[in-house]
From Swiss-Prot, chain A:
Pathway: Amino-acid biosynthesis; L-histidine biosynthesis; L-histidine from 5-phospho-alpha-D-ribose 1-diphosphate: step 1/9. The lineage of its organism: Bacteria, Bacillati, Bacillota, Clostridia, Eubacteriales. Catalyzes the condensation of ATP and 5-phosphoribose 1-diphosphate to form N'-(5'-phosphoribosyl)-ATP (PR-ATP). Has a crucial role in the pathway because the rate of histidine biosynthesis seems to be controlled primarily by regulation of HisG enzymatic activity. Belongs to the ATP phosphoribosyltransferase family. Short subfamily. Transmembrane segments: none annotated. Lacks the C-terminal regulatory region which is replaced by HisZ. This is ATP phosphoribosyltransferase. It comes from Syntrophomonas wolfei subsp. wolfei (strain DSM 2245B / Goettingen). It is found in: Cytoplasm.
C-alpha cells in the first residue's frame, strides 16, 4: 500500500555489510540492522526510510512488484531473472564473474568442442543464453548447490558458475575455460516508484553514483 | 471430464469485479463521447502481417499465434491501435477528418502473468486520426487525465516525452544500426550501468554522450529541458524540444498540468510512436496505468498516410486501485408469496418504478424467506415484500 516511506530491499548475506557501509557514507540510517535477528523490516520514522531483509534472489521480485521501491542486489541475480526493473547504479562491490569451467583433465578443450555436452549450473538462463549466443547446443542441468560436484561425479561435462577468487574451482580440480560476464552489486528501482517518488530517489541515486565512481557523497 | 483448469494468465470475473469493470467502462464511454469520440470494434484476431505493422516484429514471443485453414498465420490482437489503423485505412478513406474513435476491448499477450498483468487484458482507449500538432496531442492527454479522475483516482502522474528528441539524437549520431538498437534498449530498460559503459566505448561527440546518458533520468517540470547540452546542435531534436514545450503549455490551458511531469525516459515499447508520448502512473501500483502517444506513420503502412495520436488505459490495473468506487445501485427487493400471480404483478410494478426485484421461485413461506434474508441486508436493500 502507498506510503511516503522509501522502502529498500536489502540482500541478506555477504552483500549486507558493504551495503551498510555505503549507506553510512550516504548518511542513511542503519542502526541495529543485521540479518541475524528475527526482524525482517527495519523502519526509521524520522528519515522516512524502511529496509526489508530478503534473500538476494527475492530482491528483484520485491522491486518489480513495487513492494519495495529500491533494491540492492548482484548483477548475477538480475540477469538470471530478467525482471522488469530499472538498473540505476553500479555499486562496484561484491565482484564475481560467471565462467564456464571444465575438469583439469580436459583443460585444453575449445568452446566448440562443448557442443552437445552437458553443463551443470544454478543459473540456467544465463547458461542457456550464453551457449545459444555462441551457436552451441548444450544440455543445461539445473542444480541448487555444490555445482562443482557434478563433473566429479560424471553428471555433467562442465559447469557454469559464479567465481570470485577461483579457490573453490581449484579445490575441485576445475579450470576456468571462458568468462561469460562480470557481476557487481547494483541499485535497482521499481518503474513506477522512480516516477512517483522521484524527489526522494533521484538525489540518492546521484549520491550513490558519485560514491561508486570514487568521489565523496 | 472434471477438468477445471483454465489457461495460465486468464481469469473468471465474478459479479463484484464486473460491477467495477462496468462502472469504469461507463465512465470512460461517457467521457469519450463528451469529446465527440465514437465507438468502434475490430476483430479479436488479425493476420500476423497486420499485427506486425504495429509491433514491428519485436514481440513475436508475446503473441498468441495460430493458423487458419488456408495456411494464413493469425494472431490474437496484442493491442488495439494497429487494428484501428487498418480499419481507418479500409473504411474511412472518404471520411471527414479528424476522426475520433474509441474502444473498450480485450487484447492478448503471452506474458509472465502476475498481479495486474494478465494474458487477456481489457483496455479503454481513444484514437484521434487525421490531426497533426500539439492541440491534438493535448486533447488526447487531457482526456487521459480526465478518465482517471472520472473513475475516482486523484493521486496519479502522467509522464510526458517527445520521442523525436531521443530518435533524432540517435539517428544523427553516426552509429550503426546495431549500436543504435543497443542504446535504445538500454535506455528503454533504464539499465544505466550498462548504458554508461557502452557510451564510454563509443567514438562520438562527448556532449552527445552526456545528453544520451542524462535522458533516461531527466524528470521534472518543463525546466528540465534546459539540461540538454547537445540538443542545440541538432535541428530536429531542437524542434522536438520546442514541440514538447508547446504541448506542456497547451496542457496548462487545458487545466490538467498538475498531473503532468516531463520524463525523458518514457520511450514506450512499441515501434510505431513518432512524437509526443506519455504514460500514467499511480504511486499505489508498481505498474503503469495507461500509455499512448503520436504515431504518424502507422496508417501509411496500410496505404493511407494520416497523422494520429491516442492512448489506452489498462482497466485490469485500474480496477485494483478502485476499491470502493461510488457504484450506484437501485434498491433491491425480494418478493414472495403463495399467490404467484400476485407475486409477479407486484414484482413488475416495482421493476417499472426502477427497482431491482428478486422473486422467490421456490414457493417459500414468510418465515423461511425472512431467515434467508438474514445477513443479506446489504444486498436486498429494499427488504422483503410478502404478498
Amino acid at each position: 500500500m502507498y506510503d511516503d516511506y522509501l522502502t529498500i530491499a536489502l540482500s541478506k548475506g555477504t552483500l549486507l555489510e558493504p551495503t551498510l557501509e555505503v549507506f553510512k557514507k550516504l548518511k542513511l540510517p542503519g542502526e541495529g540492522i543485521n540479518d541475524k535477528s528475527r526482524s525482517m523490516v527495519f523502519t526509521y520514522d524520522n528519515e522516512r526510510v524502511k529496509y526489508i531483509m530478503c534473500r538476494p534472489t527475492d530482491v528483484p521480485t520485491y522491486v518489480e512488484q513495487g513492494a519495495a521501491d529500491l533494491g540492492i542486489v548482484g548483477k548475477d541475480v538480475i540477469v538470471e531473472q530478467a525482471r522488469d526493473v530499472f538498473e540505476m547504479v553500479d555499486l562496484q562491490y561484491g565482484y564475481c564473474r560467471f565462467v564456464v569451467a571444465v575438469p583439469e583433465a580436459i583443460k585444453n578443450i575449445t568452446l566448440k568442442d562443448l557442443n552437445y555436452k552437458r553443463a551443470a549450473t544454478k543459473f540456467p538462463v544465463i547458461a542457456e543464453n550464453f551457449f545459444r549466443s555462441q551457436g552451441l547446443q548444450v544440455e543445461i542441468i539445473k542444480l541448487h548447490g555444490n555445482i562443482e560436484l557434478a563433473p566429479l561425479m560424471g553428471l555433467a561435462d562442465m559447469i557454469v558458475d559464479l567465481v570470485s577468487t577461483g579457490r573453490t574451482l581449484k579445490e575441485n580440480r576445475l579450470v576456468e575455460l571462458i568468462k561469460i560476464m562480470d557481476s557487481t552489486t547494483r541499485l535497482i528501482c521499481n518503474r513506477v516508484s522512480y516516477r512517483t517518488k522521484h524527489q526522494q530517489i533521484q538525489p540518492l541515486i546521484e549520491n550513490m553514483q558519485k560514491l561508486s565512481t570514487g568521489g565523496s557523497a | 471430464m472434471k477438468s477445471r483448469k483454465i489457461s495460465r494468465g486468464l481469469r473468471d470475473l465474478l459479479p463484484p469485479e464486473l460491477k467495477v469493470r462496468r462502472f469504469m467502462e461507463e465512465k470512460a464511454a461517457a467521457l469519450f463521447a463528451s469529446y465527440a469520440y465514437e465507438e468502434v470494434m475490430t476483430p479479436t484476431f488479425e493476420y500476423l502481417e497486420v499485427v506486425e505493422m504495429g509491433t514491428g516484429g519485436n514481440i513475436r514471443e508475446e503473441l498468441f499465434l495460430f493458423m487458419d485453414r488456408e495456411g494464413g498465420i493469425l494472431s490474437l490482437r496484442p493491442e488495439m491501435t494497429t487494428g484501428i489503423a487498418r480499419l481507418a485505412a479500409t473504411h474511412l478513406r472518404d471520411a471527414v477528418f479528424p476522426q475520433r474513435l474509441y474502444y473498450l476491448s480485450n487484447s492478448f499477450r503471452y506474458v509472465q502473468p502476475h498481479l495486474a498483468q494478465y494474458r487477456e487484458f481489457w483496455q479503454a482507449g481513444i484514437e484521434l486520426l487525421g490531426a497533426e500538432g500539439v492541440r491534438a496531442d493535448a486533447e488526447v492527454i487531457t482526456i487521459a487525465v480526465k478518465a482517471l479522475q472520472e473513475m475516482g483516482l486523484d493521486n496519479f502522474k502522467i509522464s510526458l516525452n517527445q520521442i523525436a528528441i531521443f530518435n533524432s539524437l540517435l539517428d544523427d549520431s553516426g552509429l550503426n544500426r546495431e549500436e543504435k538498437d543497443c542504446i535504445r534498449s538500454l535506455v528503454e530498460n533504464k539499465d544505466l550501468v550498462e548504458l554508461s559503459r557502452v557510451l564510454e566505448s563509443l567514438d562520438i561527440d562527448d556532449e552527445l554522450k552526456e545528453t544520451i546518458a542524462i535522458l533516461p533520468v531527466l524528470h521534472g517540470g518543463i525546466e528540465v529541458l534546459k539540461r540538454l547540452p547537445y540538443v542545440e546542435k541538432n535541428q530536429r531534436a531542437l524542434a522536438a524540444v520546442q514541440e514538447l514545450r508547446e504541448v506542456y503549455e497547451t496542457l496548462q490551458l487545458c487545466g490538467v498540468i498538475d498531473h503532468i511531469v516531463v520524463d525523458m525516459g518514457v520511450l514506450r515499447g512499441l515501434d510505431y510512436y513518432t512524437g509526443t508520448v506519455f504514460e500514467g502512473y499511480s504511486p499505489e501500483l508498481g505498474y503503469g496505468l495507461l500509455g499512448g502517444g503520436r504515431y504518424d506513420h502507422l496508417l501509411g503502412k496500410f496505404g493511407f498516410p494520416c497523422p494520429a495520436t491516442g492512448f489506452a488505459l489498462g482497466m485490469d490495473r485500474l480496477a485494483l486501485l478502485l476499491k470502493h468506487p461510488a457504484l450506484q445501485k437501485a434498491p433491491r427487493y425480494l418478493v414472495g408469496g403463495k399467490d404467484f400471480a400476485a407475486v409477479i404483478a407486484r414484482a413488475e410494478e416495482l421493476r417499472k418504478q426502477g427497482f431491482a426485484v428478486e422473486i422467490d421461485v421456490e414457493g417459500k413461506s414468510r418465515q423461511e424467506l425472512e431467515r434467508k434474508l438474514e445477513g443479506r441486508e446489504n444486498c436486498i436493500t429494499g427488504g422483503l415484500i410478502y404478498v
